[in-house]
Every structure is written in C-alpha cells, then in structure tokens.
C-alpha cells in the first residue's frame, strides 16, 4: 500500500517539474509565424548555393593546375628519356667505333706484298707503298758498305771491352774495400749489357753499359713490387716498379733483444749481433725515401757517385789517365781521359735484381727524347737487357752461319745515328730498332736470315718501323708476349701483363711524333747517298789505346 502511494507521488512530482510553463527552455522559443521561418531558410539556402559554386570553381581551378603540372612533368620525363636514349646511343656508337678500331689494329697485322714479298702472314705490313716508294741500295752495295765501314767496329769493341772490364773490376774491388759490410750496401760483380755485348755497336765513340747489382746489409733485403703485380698504376707508369726494404729474418723487434740493451758478454740465440735493427732514424742509411720504406733513386745516385769517387781516389795512382763523371744526371756516367786527349766513355749503372730472375731495376738510363721521367723518386725502371742478350745468343744458334740479323740492326743503327747528328735527336732510338728486330726474329724462319738476304731483311725491318710509327704502336718484346720461348725463363707475371706500347708517348706528344716521322723519312731519303759515300770512305776513328 505504502509502495503504491510512493509511486503515485513520484509521477505527480515528475509531471510538475517537466511542465514547460514552470521551467521554460532557452531554445524553445516558437517563431511568431511560418513566413519568417521560410524566409530565413531560403536565405540560408542561397548562401549554401553560393558557397557550393565557389567551392566548385576552386576545385576546377585546382584540377586545371594539377593537369598543367602533370603535363609539364610528362614533357620533362619525355625529354629526359630522349636525352638518356641519345646518350646511350652515343655511348654505344663510341664503344662500337673503339671495337672497330681495336679489330682493325689487331687484324690488319698481315703483311703487305710490297714489304714482305707475300711471306709470313703474321708479319706486319703497310697498306700503301712501303717507305714512301724510296729504294735502298742493292745487295752488292750494302755488302760492300758493311765490310768497309761497319765490320771493323767489332774488333774495336772487343778491345774496348777487355780494357774496361779489367779497369771496372779494379774499381769495384776498391769500392768494396771501403765499405762496411754491417752497415753499407754490398756491391756485386758487374754485368755487361746492350750493344757492346750483343755485337752490334757501330756508333762512335764506343760506349759500354755495365750493370752493377747491389744488396742491402744484413738482416735486410729488397722486396720488388712490379706494376703488374695487382697494383693499379697509370699507363705512363707501366714498366716501372718500387723496391721495399724489408727484414730478411722477420721482425726482431718483438724479441727482447730488440727492446733491451744486452751486455757485451750476452748474445741473443735467435738474432746475432749483426741482426740487430738500427734506429728508425737510420733508414736513410738504407737509401730509402724520407719517412718511407721504399728505395729512393736519388739517394742511390748520391751514394753511388760518392762511393765511386772514394774508390777512384784509392787507385788513381796506379793509372796514367783521369776519371771523371760524364753526365751529372746519370749516377754512373764515367769518362776516362787519356793524356793524348782521347777519351773513353762508359756507364756503370747501379741495379737491383728482381727476385731470382734476370730482370733488373735500374735507377737511371741514358735519356731518350720519348722516354718519360719517373713521377716519383721511388719509381724504378725494369730492364730486360740481360734477357735480350740471352735471346740474341740463343737465336744465333738456330740461324744459318753468317746470319744477317745483326748486320741489319747495325746498318739501321748507323743510319739513325747519322740522321740524329744531322737534324738532332728524335723520338726514335736504337732500342726501338732492336725491339723491331727481336719481333722479326721471332716471326721469321731461320732460313730467311741468310747472309745473302741482307737487303731484303733490312727493307723488311724499315717497313716494320714505318708501320709501327704510322700506327703509333710498338709493343715491348717481352712484356705480355706469350710467343717468347719458355726456355727464356721470364716471370709469369711479366708474360701475363698487358703489352707495353713503347710508342705511347707519340700519342700524347704530337710535335715529337711529327718530328720523329719527318726524321725517319729523311733518313730513308738520305740512306742511298750516305751508304755510297761511306762505302768509298772509311772513317778515321782509330782503336782507343789501352793503358
């Protein structure tokens, strides 16, 4: 009963509270009439329509701008694609042209009938008239010229070699006696190289080239690093190497004897007294570059010149001539001056043996106009002179008796020497002549070098040189040449190396190339008259007297 009364009272109270007249709401105001409501709704609708039109115009403007940007981007993309396609096409054309050029050089190595008489397809030749149509003297004239003018130099060369070898032996022995074996470089016996020891020297005065190998004091050794041993080197540094000074017995600094000063009565059982490492500041005594472990050519030059000067002072009283340095930029360019006024030049060249081979690193060589200078004083030129001498001697055994190969080289060298004195030196040297001959010896049959074929082989040698000059390409005979007999014993790294172009300087130096080519053709033009003149006149050079 009570619960029922409570519910009735709750309903009544709720109805009173929610009555609109008792508590009116703020937003519950009823408009006065419907027309006012309709007018406001129409005004609001017009505002919405205007806003819609404005938004549609804005959207249309943005769409137009977007379309314009897309069109510009599409045009730029098409231009880029066109440019990339053009660049790619240009690159492909360049590669194609290079491939054609390489193919032309590699496959136009065949002989021309004019140059080689149709023999030996491997031999190089020319596409036009060889030697610009110039003719050399006939076989009889060449033979007479050789007998009258060149053959006599062979006997003079033998006497000169005998005299110089005896003197150099004495000089080097005096040098060794002044050296400290524990701290100074050790000088070995000399090695005769080049034309005087290959029996084709014709130029006067006769000039001997002698290699003088040297080694560092114990416990050090020389470690050569060839350009073809994996290092990345510029093209103009091919054929060079560096020589690192390392310890032959390992690092003794990790031993206590290298860190502690032992007494006079104490000796390390692992490292003797001579194996103790010198102070770091004494690396210059090992002829290394400053703050470097690599041998310095300038340091070697100074050391060798000083050592030779001291050695000569010790034996000068035994001889009736004077000894002086010939060229200041070459460490071993020496000149014997006799009291009669005559002189005898020769070159003592300090060299370092490359491992156990017959390759030698040389600090300096007589300069050729086309030769570059080392970019660094730690760059050493690799010489194949001993291998060249061995190859000529080995080849001679297979050639007919009285073979004309050296006669060809002597005549060509004679003509080049006379032309150089007439017009000045050019980029062509006697070493280029010898390189051309070595290539021909490897390609020609032994029977082609009979004495009676002197004129044909000389003509062929000059044709080879002409083609090489026109192509600006003469490969080094040993580097990268797998046709060299295995019996020569060349290091495998040298045989695997890329061929070295001795005429590469002509590609970079146009003036030198033009001068060399002009000098070569002028030499050919003057050859007949020069040979005829010297066939009737024997030079008045007399053998150099011996002391």
From Swiss-Prot:
Secretion signal, residue range per the UniProt entry: 1-15
A Gene Ontology term for the protein's cellular component: membrane
Keywords: Cell membrane, Coiled coil, Glycoprotein, Membrane, Nucleus, Phosphoprotein, Signal, Transmembrane, Transmembrane helix
Record membrane topology: Single-pass type I membrane protein
Regions of this protein lying in the Cytoplasmic compartment: 101-547
Main location: membrane
Topological region Extracellular: 16-83
Protein name (Swiss-Prot/TrEMBL): Inositol 1,4,5-trisphosphate receptor-interacting protein
Glycan attachment residues as annotated in the record: 27, 80
Key word Ligase present: no
Organism listed in the record: Homo sapiens
Family: Belongs to the ITPRIP family.
GO biological process per UniProt: extrinsic apoptotic signaling pathway via death domain receptors; negative regulation of extrinsic apoptotic signaling pathway via death domain receptors
Domain of life: Eukaryota
Function of the protein: Enhances Ca(2+)-mediated inhibition of inositol 1,4,5-triphosphate receptor (ITPR) Ca(2+) release.
Tissue distribution of the protein: Detected in brain where it is concentrated in cerebellar Purkinje cells (at protein level).
Region (Disordered): 109-129
Self-association and partners: Interacts with ITPR.
A GO term for molecular function: protein kinase inhibitor activity
Gene: ITPRIP
Cellular compartments annotated: Cell membrane; Nucleus outer membrane
Coiled coil: 32-82
Transmembrane segments: 84-100
UniProt-listed Pfam families: Mab-21_C
Residues the record lists as Phosphoserine modifications: 547
